[in-house]
C-alpha cells in the first residue's frame, strides 16, 4: 500500500492551554531533528495534530521508527489523503482491504469533523463497507471485535483513510521542561532515570566521574555509548567527563573506610552542583533507588544531599529493580549497562559501608583535609563531549581510519 502522509497524534501537550503553540513548535523542531538525514518528507505542525507529507522515495518504515522514539507523540498512522470524492474514498478503502488476511473480519469507523459533507457518519460507513465486500469476498464484517479497522476522518481540508495506529513514546516534547544534569554512572539505573525525566519534556546534560588508571578506557566508552543511545531519542547530549582519581585517593587516605562511599558521593554532588550552575540547569538527576545499596538509604541521601541546595530528582526512587531492568531493556540500554567494566563507585567500595551514616562523623572525617582546591581543579579539567546518535568513540574512529587507509 502506498501511503502519502503520516498522521502524528500529540500526547499530553493536548492538555496545554495558552502555551500549546510553544509545545507544538518544540515538538515540530524535535521531529525534524529526529529525521535528519532522511529525505522525502515535509513536516506540517498544526494545533491538534501533525502531518508528515511523504514523497514516493521516502523510507516510511525508518521515518516511523524514528518518530516512535520522539517524546510528545502519542501515536502515528500511515494515511492516504484524498479529496472529498465518494468514489475515491471507496477505492482507497478497497486498496487497504487487499492487505487483510483471507477469512479475517473488519469494520469501518468514521469521524466526521466536516459536518457539511454530504453523507453522515452511518451512511459513509455503510457505503464504504459495502464497496469493500463487493470487491473482496474473502473477508466479512464484525463491528464488535474486528481483526482490522478501516478509519476514515472527514476533515475540513481533506479526507484521511488509514488502518494502523502505531504507539508513540508519549510524554512531553523535550525542551519544554527546563534543564537537568544527569549523574550517569554506567550502571542500569541512571540511563533509565535520564529517560524518565526526558519524557517529561526536560533537556538533559550528563556528568560522569572516571578515575584512570583505576577505571579503564572501556568504562569511559561504555558511558559514551549509553549517552549515544539516549541521544537516539532526544538529539545531541553533552557529556561532561570529570577526572576524579586524585579526589578518590585522598578520600581513602583521610576518611574512615566505612564512610568512604558517603564522602565519595558527597564530592560528586559538590562537583555536579558547580556544573549545574555553569550550564544553567535547574536540577540534578540520578538513578538512586531507595534501599538498593548502602548509599541509597534515607540517612545516606540526607548526608549526601547536604552539600547542595540544588534540587535532586530521583525518578526511580520507589521502583522495584525488576521494573527498572524491564525499562532498561525496552530502551535498549540494558546490554550496554551490564558490560563488566568497573566505574569509580565500585573500585574503592569498602567491604562494610555504613548504611546509616552519622552526619557529624561525615563532617569530622572530611574536615581533616580541605577538598575545595581538588574540586575546583576537577571542574576546570572536565572534558565535554557532544554525543549524537551517530557518535563514534576515539577507538572506533581510529579503526575506521585504518580500514579506509587499507582500502
From Swiss-Prot:
Domain (THUMP) ranges: 61-165
Positions of disulphide bridges: none
Cell compartment(s), UniProt: Cytoplasm
InterPro entries reported for this sequence: Rossmann-like_a/b/a_fold, ThiI_AANH, ThiI_fer, ThiI_N, THUMP_dom, THUMP_ThiI, tRNA_STrfase, tRNA_sulfurtransferase_ThiI
Pathway note: Cofactor biosynthesis; thiamine diphosphate biosynthesis
A GO molecular function held by the record: tRNA binding
Any matching Pfam family: ThiI_fer
Catalysed transformations (reactions): [ThiI sulfur-carrier protein]-S-sulfanyl-L-cysteine + a uridine in tRNA + 2 reduced [2Fe-2S]-[ferredoxin] + ATP + H(+) = [ThiI sulfur-carrier protein]-L-cysteine + a 4-thiouridine in tRNA + 2 oxidized [2Fe-2S]-[ferredoxin] + AMP + diphosphate; [ThiS sulfur-carrier protein]-C-terminal Gly-Gly-AMP + S-sulfanyl-L-cysteinyl-[cysteine desulfurase] + AH2 = [ThiS sulfur-carrier protein]-C-terminal-Gly-aminoethanethioate + L-cysteinyl-[cysteine desulfurase] + A + AMP + 2 H(+)
Positions with a binding annotation for ATP: 183-184, 208-209, 265, 287, 296
PROSITE patterns named in the record: THUMP
GO terms classed as biological process: thiamine biosynthetic process; thiamine diphosphate biosynthetic process; thiazole biosynthetic process; tRNA 4-thiouridine biosynthesis
Keywords: ATP-binding, Cytoplasm, Nucleotide-binding, RNA-binding, Thiamine biosynthesis, Transferase, tRNA-binding
Enzyme class: transferase
Enzyme nomenclature, EC number: 2.8.1.4
One GO cellular component, as annotated: cytosol
Family to which this protein belongs: Belongs to the ThiI family.
PANTHER family: TRNA SULFURTRANSFERASE
Function comment: Catalyzes the ATP-dependent transfer of a sulfur to tRNA to produce 4-thiouridine in position 8 of tRNAs, which functions as a near-UV photosensor. Also catalyzes the transfer of sulfur to the sulfur carrier protein ThiS, forming ThiS-thiocarboxylate. This is a step in the synthesis of thiazole, in the thiamine biosynthesis pathway. The sulfur is donated as persulfide by IscS.
UniProt-recorded name of the protein: Probable tRNA sulfurtransferase
UniProt source species: Staphylococcus epidermidis (strain ATCC 35984 / DSM 28319 / BCRC 17069 / CCUG 31568 / BM 3577 / RP62A)
Amino acid at each position: 500500500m502506498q501511503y502519502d502522509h503520516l498522521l502524528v497524534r500529540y500526547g499530553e501537550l493536548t492538555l496545554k492551554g495558552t502555551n500549546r503553540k510553544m509545545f507544538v513548535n518544540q515538538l515540530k523542531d524535535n521531529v525534524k531533528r529526529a529525521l535528519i538525514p532522511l529525505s522525502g518528507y515535509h513536516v506540517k505542525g498544526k494545533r491538534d495534530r501533525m502531518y508528515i507529507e511523504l514523497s514516493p522515495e521516502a523510507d516510511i518504515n525508518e521515518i516511523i521508527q524514528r518518530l516512535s522514539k520522539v517524546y510528545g507523540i502519542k501515536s502515528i498512522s500511515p494515511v492516504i489523503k484524498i479529496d472529498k470524492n465518494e468514489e475515491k474514498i471507496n477505492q482507497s478503502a478497497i486498496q487497504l482491504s487487499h492487505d487483510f488476511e483471507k477469512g479475517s473480519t473488519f469494520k469501518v469507523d468514521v469521524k466526521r469533523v466536516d459536518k457539511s459533507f454530504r453523507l453522515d457518519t452511518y451512511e459513509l460507513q455503510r457505503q464504504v463497507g459495502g464497496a469493500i465486500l463487493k470487491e473482496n469476498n474473502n473477508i466479512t464484517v464484525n463491528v464488535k471485535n474486528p481483526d482490522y479497522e478501516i478509519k476514515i476522518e472527514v476533515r475540513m481540508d481533506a479526507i484521511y483513510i488509514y488502518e494502523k495506529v502505531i504507539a508513540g513514546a508519549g510524554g512531553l516534547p523535550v525542551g519544554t521542561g527546563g534543564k537537568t544534569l544527569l549523574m550517569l554512572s554506567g550502571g542500569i539505573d541512571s540511563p533509565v532515570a535520564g529517560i524518565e525525566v526526558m519524557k517529561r519534556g526536560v533537556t538533559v546534560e550528563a556528568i560522569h566521574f572516571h578515575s584512570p588508571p583505576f577505571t579503564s578506557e572501556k568504562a569511559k566508552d561504555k558511558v559514551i555509548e549509553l549517552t549515544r543511545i539516549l541521544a537516539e531519542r532526544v538529539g545531541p547530549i553533552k557529556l561532561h567527563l570529570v577526572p576524579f582519581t586524585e579526589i578518590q585517593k585522598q578520600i581513602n587516605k583521610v576518611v574512615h573506610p566505612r564512610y568512604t562511599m558517603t564522602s565519595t558521593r558527597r564530592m560528586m554532588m559538590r562537583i555536579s552542583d558547580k556544573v549545574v550552575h555553569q550550564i544553567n540547569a535547574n536540577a540534578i538527576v540520578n538513578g538512586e533507588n531507595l534501599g538498593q545499596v548502602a548509599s541509597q538509604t534515607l540517612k545516606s541521601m540526607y548526608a549526601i544531599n547536604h552539600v547542595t541546595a540544588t534540587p535532586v530528582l530521583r525518578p526511580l526512587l520507589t521502583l522495584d529493580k525488576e521494573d527498572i531492568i524491564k525499562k532498561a531493556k525496552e530502551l535498549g540500554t540494558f546490554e550496554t549497562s551490564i558490560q563488566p567494566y568497573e566505574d569509580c563507585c565500585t573500585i574503592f567500595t569498602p567491604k562494610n559501608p555504613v548504611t546509616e551514616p552519622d552526619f557529624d562523623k561525615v563532617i569530622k572525617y572530611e574536615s581533616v583535609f580541605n577538598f575545595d582546591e581538588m574540586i575546583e581543579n576537577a571542574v576546570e579539567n572536565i572534558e565535554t563531549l557532544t554525543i549524537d546518535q551517530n557518535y563514534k568513540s576515539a577507538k572506533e574512529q581510529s579503526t575506521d581510519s585504518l580500514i579506509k587507509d587499507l582500502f
